[in-house]
């Protein structure tokens, strides 16, 4: 891995990570990993032969006001990577400066990405701007999720102040499939029905049969989960007061979708069990 140290300026970390995966006759390999500052990855491993499993490491102290993190992931033709993290991401309270996280993913022909990060926790007073953009080829495959925690509900702490600006985009052959923006500020959580846990799971390509199968699995979550299918993109939403309910539902649906979308049996990362 090529790394460049970054200085911690008074306005925060300026960190970046650029990953490129390529396919070989034996397996997908991490062809290059360039990082600046406290963004890095562990050594890839292969619990299911050719698929590359990779753990991405965020700054150990979390993300604070003034930090800007940029992540770029490139999957060359026929490559397959599953990326997760050993722990939750954290946005801490800020006295004013924004904390930014920009994530861009580029999938070429027949490439497969499973982007399965753990929770992102927003402490009260955080001022966070997040952007996740997926660029797909029509023959590529995507299973991706994000799970936000507003405050620390386990200790009855709410996201009583601060701002969160999040943007989620999916592009297919340079045409937009999904462009979604969410704004939360000043403790007003009415747009999420005052739920502290917000989950989104994306699947491409998907069919009407997959949509109906997912909806059947969401029945037990009452009105706080739903699924839609638009031009082959399956979008599944979750709201919850309980992180275990939300996490379990997302993981169960991922396990259900994986054999249909990428023709592989589920192989949950070991780090999820710790």
UniProtKB/Swiss-Prot annotation:
GO terms for cellular component: cytoplasm. It is found in: Cytoplasm. Keywords: Chaperone, Cytoplasm, Nickel insertion. One of its GO terms (molecular function) is nickel cation binding. Its main location: cytoplasm. UreD, UreF and UreG form a complex that acts as a GTP-hydrolysis-dependent molecular chaperone, activating the urease apoprotein by helping to assemble the nickel containing metallocenter of UreC. The UreE protein probably delivers the nickel. Belongs to the UreD family. HAMAP family: UreD. Required for maturation of urease via the functional incorporation of the urease nickel metallocenter. This is Urease accessory protein UreD. It comes from Enterobacter sp. (strain 638). The lineage of its organism: Bacteria, Pseudomonadati, Pseudomonadota, Gammaproteobacteria, Enterobacterales.
């Amino acid at each position: 891995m090529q790394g460049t140290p970054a200085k911690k300026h008074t306005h925060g970390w300026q960190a970046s990570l650029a990953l490129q995966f390529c396919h070989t006759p034996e397996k997908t390999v991490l062809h290059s990993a360039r990082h600046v500052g406290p963004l890095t990855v562990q050594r890839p491993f292969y619990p299911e032969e050719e698929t590359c499993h990779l753990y991405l490491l965020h700054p150990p102290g979390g993300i604070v006001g003034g930090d800007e993190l940029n992540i770029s992931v490139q999957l060359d033709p026929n490559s397959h990577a599953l990326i997760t993290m050993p722990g939750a991401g954290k946005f801490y309270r800020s006295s004013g400066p924004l904390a930014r996280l920009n994530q861009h993913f580029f999938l070429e022909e027949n490439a497969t990405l499973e982007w399965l990060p753990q929770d992102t926790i927003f402490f009260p007073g955080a001022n966070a701007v997040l952007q996740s953009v997926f660029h797909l080829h029509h023959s590529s495959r995507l299973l991706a999720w994000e799970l936000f925690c507003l405050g620390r509900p386990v200790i009855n702490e709410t996201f009583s102040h601060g701002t969160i600006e999040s943007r989620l985009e999916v592009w297919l052959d340079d045409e937009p499939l999904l462009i979604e923006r969410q704004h939360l500020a000043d403790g007003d959580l009415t747009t999420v029905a005052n739920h502290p846990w917000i989950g989104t799971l994306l699947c491409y390509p998907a069919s009407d049969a997959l949509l109906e199968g997912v909806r059947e699995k969401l029945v037990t979550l009452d009105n706080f989960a739903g699924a839609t299918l638009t031009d082959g993109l399956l979008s599944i939403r979750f709201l919850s007061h309980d992180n275990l309910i939300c996490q379990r539902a997302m993981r169960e649906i991922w396990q259900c979708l994986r054999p249909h979308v990428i023709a592989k049996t589920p192989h949950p990362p070991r780090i999820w069990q710790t």
